């Protein structure tokens, strides 16, 4: 099973990266793949309570790949790190199958509390360059996190989140229009003029009514 996962990791590179040309190139030059393999070994030692050895492996991997993955983090099959440099994955992070992350991604905590404090990333999610997913939250199946986003709340399945803080803009293939366009922003001066115009029309009506009463008297 372990070696099957390693083979799947290689195949995933070919599936995800059109620049991959040969097995020898992928095995020798893809730092994201090296980081994943190192983590799988470190995690195996961590589960056997060989914590120090697991941390040594993860630190050596960090030095050579620029990717920091705590050996306690749980990572599923066919995980792909594209470019890799600057990726951080915290201790209690849980990642499902077929997940892709890009360079500069942080799956981190929001404080120094004990217990579950890092994100859970469900199957088929994609987290783009520089995104920060923080805290004990869940990123749903097939969700996409836009580049540079900061996500602090749960992300629904099959949705796209962008911005700081992250907000859902697409869910189940349908756009959610939560962005205020500049032309749609409220204009307090214009609103006040319109209110004054309504008051003037009301006063004109009252004056006209009084004039008619005086003429009739």
Curated annotation (Swiss-Prot):
Pathway(s) where this gene product acts: Amino-acid biosynthesis; L-cysteine biosynthesis; L-cysteine from L-serine: step 1/2
EC numbers on record: 2.3.1.30
Single annotated GO MF: serine O-acetyltransferase activity
Family matches, as InterPro entries: Hexapep, Hexapep_transf_CS, LbH_SAT, Ser_AcTrfase_N, Ser_AcTrfase_N_sf, Ser_O-AcTrfase, Serine_acetyltransferase, Trimer_LpxA-like_sf
Source organism, top-level taxon: Bacteria
Example of a GO cellular component annotation carried by this entry: cytoplasm
Keywords assigned: Acyltransferase, Amino-acid biosynthesis, Cysteine biosynthesis, Cytoplasm, Repeat, Transferase
PROSITE patterns: HEXAPEP_TRANSFERASES
Database matches in Gene3D superfamilies: Hexapeptide repeat proteins, serine acetyltransferase, domain 1
GO biological process: cysteine biosynthetic process from serine
Reactions accelerated catalytically: L-serine + acetyl-CoA = O-acetyl-L-serine + CoA
Subcellular location: Cytoplasm
Documented activity regulation: Inhibited by cysteine.
Function of the molecule: Catalyzes the acetylation of serine by acetyl-CoA to produce O-acetylserine (OAS).
UniProt family annotation: Belongs to the transferase hexapeptide repeat family.
PANTHER family, per database record: SERINE ACETYLTRANSFERASE (PTHR42811)
This protein's name: Serine acetyltransferase
Lineage, highest ranks first: Bacteria, Bacillati, Bacillota, Bacilli, Bacillales
């Amino acid at each position: 099973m372990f070696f099957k996962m390693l083979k799947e990791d290689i195949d995933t590179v070919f599936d995800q990266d059109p620049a991959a040309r040969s097995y020898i190139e992928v095995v020798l030059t893809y730092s994201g793949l090296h980081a994943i393999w190192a983590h799988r070994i470190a995690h195996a030692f961590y589960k056997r309570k060989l914590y120090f050895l697991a941390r040594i492996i993860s630190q050596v991997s960090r030095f050579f790949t620029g990717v920091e993955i705590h050996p306690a983090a749980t990572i599923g099959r066919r995980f792909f790190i594209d470019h890799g440099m600057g990726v951080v994955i915290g201790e209690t992070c849980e990642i499902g199958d077929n997940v892709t992350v890009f360079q500069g991604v942080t799956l981190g905590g929001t404080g120094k509390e004990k217990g579950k404090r890092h994100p859970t990333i469900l199957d088929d999610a994609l987290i783009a360059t520089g995104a920060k997913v923080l805290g004990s939250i869940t990123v749903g199946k097939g969700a996409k996190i836009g580049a540079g986003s900061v996500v602090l709340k749960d992300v629904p399945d099959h949705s796209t989140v962008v911005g700081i803080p992250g907000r859902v803009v697409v869910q189940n293939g349908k756009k959610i229009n939560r962005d205020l366009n500049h032309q749609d922003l409220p204009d307090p001066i214009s609103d006040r003029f319109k209110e004054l115009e309504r008051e003037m029309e009301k006063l004109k009506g009252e004056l006209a009514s009084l004039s008619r009463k005086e003429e009739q008297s």
